[in-house]
Amino acid sequence: MSVKLSSNRIEIRLAGEGGQGMILAGIILAEAAAIYDNKNAIQTQSYGPESRGGASKAEVIIGPGEIDFPEVIAADILVAVSQEACDKYASNLKKDGILIVDSDKVGRVPTNRAIQLPITQMAIETTGKSITANVVTLGILVGLTGIVSRQAIEKAVAARAPKGTEEMNLAALEKGFEAAAQANGK
């Protein structure tokens, strides 16, 4: 499945449960765009009162010019790594938007155009840790869309990875790129 984004302003929502790392993924994506690709980007986040298990989302807007409204109006891309997130946010996806779901966590998708990949399983197979699923997700997202350069996301992941885990996180990112290439039939 080849993915094209038509808008100059790209609105991305990464949503799941607390502890799945979607907020960190949003921060890394925004840093890749703003710091390493010299694009304008803004990142916002919200989460429930629970430290783990409650709903959480990160929104990233990337554009060539000034970003005058810092929230997603209608998502170009929705990444849903929990059923609750998919159910809650899929209706706010643009008609031609891209829905990426973790098939390990999301059983019901509202469209046959969804890109369904076993993200958590890929993370465990690659790094032995489900916590790296957020970085696998970034590889898939960037690999499918090209919203930031591969070099930018690699630098941003390496900069945010806890000391001593850079190699593991870059392996998770690479796994995401491989999954995106397979989804694109390349």
What are these model-predicted stretches?
Residues S2-K186:
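Active-site cofactor/cluster-binding pocket
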